[in-house]
Amino acid sequence: MPKVGMQPIRRSQLIAATLEAVDQVGMADASIAYIARLAGVSNGIISHYFNDKNGLLEATMRHLMQALSAAVGKRRRALDEDSPRAHLRAMIDGNFDDSQVSGPAMKTWLAFWASSMHQPALRRLQRVNDHRLYSNLCGQFRRVLPQDQARFAARGLASLIDGLWLRGALSGEAFDTEQARRIAYDYLDLQLNKAR
């Protein structure tokens, strides 16, 4: 008989082991057996909670997306002002939060993006993530720019955030979050200056 309350603990343990496995050996070599060994559980436990490796990857991505949403939300709730610039900066900062730029998170995001081109469930998650960023950016730009300019600025900033993140992930060095923020802030200010 399973212990009451173990499911959330076990799921978190397996997601953490997945992040560690992808960091150590990459997604292709992060087998169910390897992940189970890192988590200190049997292979059957993964099948019980996630059905298969794809289910575990999907749960891991949901975990990273929730961490991203929490990082952005925390920064936005802490704002002293309600200006579009302040909200947009908080979104930039949240996307470069430690939870998103650690080695395990970055490698897992990269594996997720590659897998999302072939797996419908992951493709849906990617579309949700992309739309959420674009929609939130566009909503703030729309407060000060005409609709077409707001959409253009939001698409540009979303692309810049993703591009800076991707370059940082592939650099092989520690992610320079301060430099990434400065570049994104510069683009943000260029777009907001169009409102004058």
Swiss-Prot record:
Keywords: DNA-binding, Repressor, Transcription, Transcription regulation. Residues 8-68 form the HTH tetR-type domain. Pathway: Amine and polyamine biosynthesis; betaine biosynthesis via choline pathway [regulation]. Pfam families: TetR_C_6, TetR_N. One of its GO terms (biological process) is glycine betaine biosynthetic process from choline. The keyword Nucleotidyltransferase does not apply. One of its GO terms (molecular function) is DNA-binding transcription factor activity. InterPro entries: BetI_C (IPR039538), DNA-bd_HTH_TetR-type_CS (IPR023772), Homeodomain-like_sf (IPR009057), HTH-type_TetR-like_transc_reg (IPR050109), HTH_TetR (IPR001647), Tet_transcr_reg_TetR-rel_C_sf (IPR036271), Tscrpt_rep_BetI (IPR017757). The keyword rRNA-binding does not apply. It comes from the Bacteria. Residues 31-50 bind DNA. Repressor involved in the biosynthesis of the osmoprotectant glycine betaine. It represses transcription of the choline transporter BetT and the genes of BetAB involved in the synthesis of glycine betaine. PANTHER family: HTH-TYPE TRANSCRIPTIONAL REGULATOR BETI, HTH-TYPE TRANSCRIPTIONAL REGULATOR RUTR. This is HTH-type transcriptional regulator BetI.
